[in-house]
């Protein structure tokens, strides 16, 4: 029912749900626990389904929750478009400190890159840049939100090699819109060892 695609990061995958369409539209089961389990995309029970709305140029991240409230996420864009960025911050992982940037946008039968989800396991930092006004993210999480367990890595940490400037230029973003809070996160090198592989 779903297609699992390697991202180059250990344990992090692009997910393509099945889509059944005709001239009236389409139906897509965007989460089936049994299919996820069969593909090794494990959730410790879905606790919440969240949505966020962002203007063009908004950058959020790079966020995670610390143990024991760390979260697995299944992320998709249901309106607009965004580039989703994930960083492996698990010490000892073969892809520690590496990142992937994935274009996410709603399903369009004429666009092979559309309708993708991103499976973000525990031990990864997550963020994105919104490419259009009124971009809406939807994501499932397997642990509840815990403000005192919030963590983050500086979104533009130079050691991570994320080509934010290239993204901004390609999509006509003159100046990213970021929060003061996200600008205060430490770089990965200066951060505590939150996760072990």
Model regions and ranges:
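Short strand-turn motif at the edge of the Rossmann-like AdoMet-binding core
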Residues: 141
